[in-house]
Amino acid sequence: MTTSKTNGTTAAVDPFDDPVTSNKMAIRALIPLLITFVLGTLCLQGFNLVFQQVGTDVGAPNQASLITAFPSIVLGIVCFIYGSLGDFVSLRRLVTVGLVTLFVGSIFGFVANYFFAANLWTVIIARVLQTAGEQVAGSAFLVVATKYLRNDLKVIFFGLFTAAYQLSASIGVFAAGILSSIAWQFLFLIPSVTILFLPILLKTLPSKSGNGQKVDALGFVIFGFATAFLTLFFSYMAWWMLVVSVVLYVAFGVYINKAANPFITPAFFRNTRWLRAISLILVFYFV
């Protein structure tokens, strides 16, 4: 935030109100956000590879799938929610909370399982914190690129985002293979270095707090539980979980039609392009 003088008075000027300045600020923010997303995804892919070994080491081989199931549930929920939270909470605050959560999860996971007896639930808690934290970077990257970049740069940065995801997924498998032969606990530390980006992001991310409306907490809760049960259904194929998920999604549909300011409006689901894209994804997934 800068200041300008007009008729003897000093007024605050938001650099993101100027297209040229906002483009420069966005580029400076996007690089650390992309690196954070890459390191977080790398850690995610690494644990997806070694979760059976981790389950055996913590004495719970039959529950090893929970190490990937719970973070997957969190990922499915936050991917949708973080984008909507940008309408209520400033990106600066959202990313700050995300990086701190990622750092806490990384340090907690390493210390609790390397210096003390490794435990299934300390692994799960740490991975949930890491997943929730790192996904903030991915969501913030897409929001910043969409809102503040010049049109000719948007395609470039969206391409970088896709390429970075594929690269991190590949390197994650490689890193897991190396670190698992030493100590899988070191996987927790991979994204911890991203806390160093916080000072840069505090200077380059917008501090506007959206439209001033209150966060739609009830809507987030209903949608979150519906998504959680749907994810659990695909992990355990328990039909009652699918039934609960459907009931909650129906309740969510009723809620957003009656709520004054839902975090997502019914008009979103009437978007024909979105419906076609989702239909194609479902066809390719199930056929």
What label would you give each PLM region?
Residues 1-42, 53:
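Cytosolic juxtamembrane N-terminal segment immediately preceding the first transmembrane helix
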Residues 35, 39, 51, 101-102, ...:
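Hydrophobic residues within membrane-embedded alpha-helical segments of Major Facilitator Superfamily
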Residues 18-26, 112-117, 266-272:
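Helix-boundary and loop/linker segments of multi-pass membrane transporters
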Residues 26-43, 48, 68-70, 105, ...:
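12-transmembrane solute porter fold
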Residues 65-68, 72-75, 79-212:
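Helix-loop-helix hairpins in multi-pass membrane proteins, especially solute transporters
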Residues 55, 59, 133, 148-150, ...:
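Short helix-loop-helix connector
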Residues 182-279:
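Hydrophobic transmembrane-helix bundles of small-molecule transporters
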Residues 46-61, 145:
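Membrane-interface helix caps of multi-pass secondary transporters
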